[in-house]
């Protein structure tokens, strides 16, 4: 038997360019519509689990209704908290720009002021992932979540170094993207990742 995990990143948000971690900003109408375009690929899903942040939860509720599935939320699927710079438009950041630049160059070495460390974020997400794959709860699970969460899961599945800046600088997880991970249920199975 194979287990499918569809990782959906929320659509584009209603806000200026910024690091939106724990800031609970709404998804834009166009972003929601773009995410909803995946609903046919999700047919046959057995459950939907969403980040509790409204940019994910709004679309997850609509998907759950369309697919006639129960929706649950998991705080562990929330984006990394970016501390004092969370939700601040980039155009408004002046004095703290060097801190932001250092974070972008090496996020595992430079935690933003008041932020969740990358190590804590990684441990939170990977802990959730390990629990959910140990008890799949059906053969097709949809996770509506955030770009950072998806990167952490991909790094775990592929055995990549989650501290490497390349994971954050070179792996693009677009808004409203669908990443499908298939795990076969036998000891020597190799996970397969598809970007749809």
Question: What are these language model-derived features?
Answer:
Residues 1-4, 80-92, 137, 155-196:
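Acidic, low-complexity terminal tails and accessory targeting/binding regions
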Residues 4, 8-69:
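Active-site-proximal alpha-helix that buttresses catalytic centers in soluble enzyme cores
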Residues 5, 137-148:
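Generic beta-sheet signal
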Residues 42-44, 132-139:
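Glycine-rich phosphate-binding loop signature in dinucleotide/nucleotide-binding domains
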Residues 50-51, 123, 144-145:
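Short beta-strand scaffold positions
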Residues 65-127:
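Phosphate-handling substructures
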Residues 147-151, 177:
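GST superfamily/GST-like fold recognition
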């Amino acid at each position: 038997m194979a287990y499918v995990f569809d990782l959906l990143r929320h659509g584009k948000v209603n806000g200026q360019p910024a690091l939106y971690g724990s800031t609970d900003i709404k998804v834009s109408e166009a972003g929601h519509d773009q995410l909803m375009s995946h609903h046919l690929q999700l047919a046959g899903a057995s459950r939907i689990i969403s980040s509790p942040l409204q940019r994910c939860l709004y679309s997850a509720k609509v998907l759950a209704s369309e697919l006639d599935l129960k929706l649950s939320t998991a705080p562990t699927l929330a984006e990394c908290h970016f501390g004092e710079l969370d939700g601040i438009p980039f155009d408004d950041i002046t004095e703290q720009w060097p801190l932001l630049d250092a974070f972008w160059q090496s996020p595992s070495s430079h935690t933003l002021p008041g932020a969740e460390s990358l190590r804590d974020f990684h441990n939170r997400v990977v802990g959730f992932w390990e629990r959910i794959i140990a008890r799949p709860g059906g053969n097709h699970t949809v996770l509506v979540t955030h770009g950072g969460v998806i990167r952490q899961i991909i790094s775990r599945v592929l055995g990549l170094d989650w501290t490497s800046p390349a994971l954050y600088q070179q792996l693009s997880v677009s808004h409203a993207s669908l990443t499908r991970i298939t795990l076969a249920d036998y000891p020597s199975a190799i996970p397969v990742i598809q970007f749809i």
